[in-house]
Curated annotation (Swiss-Prot):
This is Putative N-acetylmannosamine-6-phosphate 2-epimerase. Converts N-acetylmannosamine-6-phosphate (ManNAc-6-P) to N-acetylglucosamine-6-phosphate (GlcNAc-6-P). The gene is nanE. The keyword Isomerase applies. It is an enzyme of class 5 (isomerase). Pathway: Amino-sugar metabolism; N-acetylneuraminate degradation; D-fructose 6-phosphate from N-acetylneuraminate: step 3/5.
Amino acid sequence: MGNSVMEKIKGGLVVSCQALEDEPLHSAFIMSKMALAAVQGGAVGIRANTAKDIRAIQSEVDVPIIGIYKKDYDDSDVFITPTLKEVREICETGVEIVAMDATTRKRPHNEDLKDILSAIRKEFPNTLFMADTGSIEDVYYADSLGFDLIGTTLYGYTEETANKNISDHDFSHMKEVLKSTKRPVIAEGKIDSPSKARQVLTLGCYAVVVGGAVTRPQEITTRFTNEIKKI
C-alpha cells in the first residue's frame, strides 16, 4: 500500500479538514462534506482528526487520509495522537497514514515514542507513519526512529519555535529540514496562501498540507476584517 499511497499524494495538496469542539463547524458530517469539496477542488488527500470524522470522510471521498487524534493530557504538552491508545484507534479506521507528535517533549504517562512506533508497526505493518515535528532536532529524532514521512506541522507551535513562520527568512527552516532527512517531507503549518504552497513544493517538499486557509471560515473572515479595519 505504501508506494501507491505515496504516488497519489506526490506533488499535491492535502487539505486538513478539522473543527474542534469549540468551533462552529464541529461535526463529522460537516467535515465529510468539507473533504468532498476539497477533493472536488483538486485535493489529493485529506488530513482529519478523530476516528468519527475519519469514518465520515471515508464514506465521501476515495483519497489517502492522514489521520490524527488531538487529545489533551494534564501531564504533557503533546496532544497530536499522543499515546499508543490514540495511535491504535486511528490505525483501526484503516487510514493510509497516521500522524503523531514526534517532538522530543515528554509524552503523557511517560510513554516513549520509540516504543509506540515499534509496537504499532507490528500491529499495522501496512500503515505509513508521519512525524509531526517542530525543531530540526525533532526532525533528526523522527528520522532516527524510522518514520515514513516527516512533517513540519508543529514549527511555530512548540515552546522552542513559538511565533516562527515557515516562510521566515526565505523558508530557511524548510530548507534545513530538506537537507536533514532523505525521507519525504510534508510541508505543513501556517501554509496560508497558494504562493507559499507552491514555494514549498518548488523547494523539494513531497506534498503540502493546508488547513485553516481553506477550511476555517472564521479564520478566513478574520483576515479580511482585520485588513478592512486598517482603513
